[in-house]
């Protein structure tokens, strides 16, 4: 009897320990781990070095626009940040060299302090992501209306044809595009395409066999 009570008490104690864990959110459970506390303190994933998170020292324009940007944003809460930057850039250009000089001195002082604090600092700008090239062909310009009708892309032909006909006709079309006059390209190539397709379809293996069987022997 004593052993049964101990086992039931043990199960109740285990359930009491597990109930609060299920009632808490995943964010609370995540922040209890030591690795998560380290991430919260460092502000990242813990793998980045301090040099990667060091900001560049401000230049003269940044020193000057630090207070002016705040004032313009308060006066114009609906203005976007890009518009504020344009306005501040225009105002900065309108200042004289004498008016800019105190901000240049402050920027030099900040750069010297930054150099002493981070002697191994090197500015590493982020590379812009290159736009992915699309495999789809763009439509031709309006000035090449004639050539647009005879492009190699099969979807652009105004008539139907077989693959064997198109594969044999494409090299011929490319040769004519490089050597013939641009005025009569569309008409001549379309006529050649129709003629070649009609002859190739007419001279199929079955048709050739019929012709050979019908020819008289020598």
From Swiss-Prot:
Q: List locations, semicolon-separated.
A: Nucleus speckle; Cytoplasm; Nucleus
CDD domains from the xrefs?
HMG-box_SoxA_SRY
What keyword terms does UniProt attach to this protein? Answer: Activator, Calmodulin-binding, Cytoplasm, Differentiation, DNA-binding, Nucleus, Sexual differentiation, Transcription, Transcription regulation
Q: Matching InterPro entries, A to Z?
A: HMG_box_dom, HMG_box_dom_sf, SRY, SRY-related_HMG-box_TF-like
Q: Which residues bind DNA?
A: 54-122
GO terms of molecular function: calmodulin binding; DNA-binding transcription activator activity, RNA polymerase II-specific; RNA polymerase II cis-regulatory region sequence-specific DNA binding
User: Do you know which SUPFAM superfamilies this protein is assigned to?
Assistant: HMG-box (SSF47095)
Which GO CC terms are listed, alphabetically? cytoplasm; nuclear speck; nucleus
User: SMART domains recorded for this chain?
Assistant: HMG
Q: Which domain of life is it from?
A: Eukaryota
What GO biological process, any one, is recorded here? sex differentiation
Per the entry, what this protein does is: Transcriptional regulator that controls a genetic switch in male development. It is necessary and sufficient for initiating male sex determination by directing the development of supporting cell precursors (pre-Sertoli cells) as Sertoli rather than granulosa cells. Involved in different aspects of gene regulation including promoter activation or repression. Binds to the DNA consensus sequence 5'-[AT]AACAA[AT]-3'. SRY HMG box recognizes DNA by partial intercalation in the minor groove and promotes DNA bending. Also involved in pre-mRNA splicing.
Q: How does it assemble?
A: Interacts with CALM, EP300, HDAC3, KPNB1, ZNF208 isoform KRAB-O, PARP1, SLC9A3R2 and WT1. The interaction with EP300 modulates its DNA-binding activity. The interaction with KPNB1 is sensitive to dissociation by Ran in the GTP-bound form. Interaction with PARP1 impaired its DNA-binding activity.
Q: Which family does it belong to?
A: Belongs to the SRY family.
**Name the UniProt record assigns to this protein:** Sex-determining region Y protein
Organism equals Mirounga angustirostris (Northern elephant seal)
From which lineage does this chain's organism come? Eukaryota, Metazoa, Chordata, Craniata, Vertebrata
